[in-house]
Amino acid sequence: MNPIKPPFTLNQYFAAWFVHVFTASAACIGVFSLYKIYQHDYVFALWLMAITVFIDAVDGSLARLVHVKSVLPKIDGALLDNIVDYLNYVITPCFFLLVKPGMLPADYVVPITAAITITSAYQFCQDDAKTPDHFFKGFPCYWNITVFYMYIFNTSMIVNTVLLSLFCVLIFIPVKYVYPSRLDYLTESRVLKILMHCCSALYGISSFCLLVNYPETNKLWVSLSLGYVGMYLFLSFYRTYYPMFKAKITANNKD
């Protein structure tokens, strides 16, 4: 009688577990970033926060590459990702806002951070927070990136208050925000997908350089970093509303 072979090789199991541990490592780094914020070492904390963003940016692609759902079906990678992301994208930047002087007016620190945590909890628990066609529905809780820009550009407390309040509201507005690592439904063009990935990489490099050069700011890196943000928002609103306008025009033409 031939022994029953496992459905996957040892290397496949190792690769799948590695990806899950890689994702979970971002939670560990997130705790260290909280510690650095507590020590008022804000630049170091931002570096650690940047590492968690990098991990989040690539772990999904790695998971699909090694087929983690098939190899480890009893491990919920999406749940793990949400747990880690809520720490790094919500709790850590809220702690930054609470600890760092000058980020928010004293009377607004607690209400704003409370609003962020509650609205973000709503965002994370929606069934369609990530839509079937791979977009984020509503503002995708980029609070860590928001705090990064506020710190780098030393924006005023009033500006910070207005922006953070606006983003809390945008969580409830069903705009489809681009999922940078899942571009299949954004465009069918292979060239445009490659171009988008290149732009994302360039954004990472420019943001890296902004942090390296802090407190000095270089116009090139500022332009590239904010230019990507502008492009991201344009594509998100275009992808949300253009199909609606197109369908309405088509319906009117038929009438």
UniProtKB/Swiss-Prot annotation:
Protein name: Phosphatidylcholine synthase
Chain ranges on the Periplasmic side, renumbered to this chain: 35-42, 98-103, 155, 212-217
Family designation: Belongs to the CDP-alcohol phosphatidyltransferase class-I family.
Keyword Ligase tagged: no
Biological processes annotated in GO: phospholipid biosynthetic process
Enzyme category, top tier: transferase
Main location, first listed in the record: membrane
InterPro entries xrefs: CDP-OH_P_trans, CDP-OH_PTrfase_TM_dom, PcS
Record's keyword annotation contains Transport: no
Domain of life: Bacteria
Chain segments annotated as transmembrane: 14-34, 43-63, 77-97, 104-124, 134-154, 156-175, 191-211, 218-238
Record's bilayer topology term: Multi-pass membrane protein
